[in-house]
Amino acid sequence: MINESSAHINTRTTLPSALLAWEIFLTDQGSSPHTITAFLGDLHLLASYLPPDRQVGEISLADLNNFLRWMENERNVPCSPKTLARRITSLKSFFRWLHEGGAIQANPAEKVVQKSVRSPLPEVLTPDEVTRIIDTAREYRQGPDPDLRSFLLFTLILETGIKKGECLSLSPNHINLDASNGPLVFIRYASPQNRYKERKLPLSEEWIEAYHEYRVQYQLDDRLFPWSARMLEYVLEDLGKDAGITKRVSFSMCRWTSAVQDWRSGIDQNKIRQKLGISEVQFREISRKLHTLSRDQSGEDLTEESTPES
């Protein structure tokens, strides 16, 4: 299969020149800046290891294995198992592209052994625990001394799967109550490098109702949650304790629980990735974990074979 970005490349093309074309291909395919930077960084390291005039058709399986051995043991720069596994993924992706595009006759990376990483599974809330926490948060909301903060914080993370840093950065201006497809929260980033993480996520009717009450209770200025990160962690922990949950409820646990709920609901995997605001490379590991967590929440198997996130 020949693609436009590799059509002018042949066995005599040097590795640096081929990488320029690969960057164009990745960009045209809609890969995130994070993915492109990671993949190109790994292949530029290979280019610095090989002779500068080495042609792509001359690169062999032995060259790649020697490169990986050098990176692990001789470079004198730490290379964790997760980093090594990601770099092998980069090699396989690049040489597969060359081979499928007709630039090389054989794929030297095809038989490179992928290194697996035993990565601990995150702890998530069961559906019953989620129900108990939401019921407790509703009691806070409807009690004689109403507390809207706990309900708003927990349900926001559960509905949207946003990260702690994203939650702390939210302002009331990021809540759009009049969007054409229904109320939403706009996750924004100041840095252009992180613009690919920006996304608009829908909000439930119950959350919007609580939000109106919350704005009456708290005089909000430029932050939706005007407290420190640690204080909000305590809010989630205390909510879990009051609901009788033995696990330590955290931002990360709520984010993973949100993703597992979406996975179990059969939502398209790419939509889950976009909702979480992560790259294709990161989602390779995360999707495996979501599959395992969705299949079994018994807590008996706490590790899995997976490709690392970058």
Spans of model-derived segments:
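Active-site/catalytic core of tyrosine-dependent DNA strand-transfer enzymes
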Residues: P202-T246, S258
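Basic, Lys/Arg- and aromatic-enriched nucleic-acid-binding interface segment
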Residues: R132-T160, K164
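Alpha-helix N-cap/helix-start motif at helix boundaries, enriched for small hydrophobics
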Residues: L91, L153-F154, G161, G165-L170, ...
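Conserved tyrosine-mediated DNA breakage-rejoining catalytic core shared by Y-recombinases
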Residues: S169-W207
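Short basic/aromatic active-site micro-motif
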Residues: L148-R149, T246-G266, L276-Q282
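Catalytic-site neighborhood detector that most strongly recognizes the C-terminal catalytic loop/helix
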Residues: V124, L276-S310
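DNA breakage-rejoining catalytic core of tyrosine-based enzymes
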Residues: R118-D135, N194-E205
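N-terminal core-binding DNA-recognition domain of tyrosine recombinases/integrases
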Residues: I2-S5, L20-L121, Y140
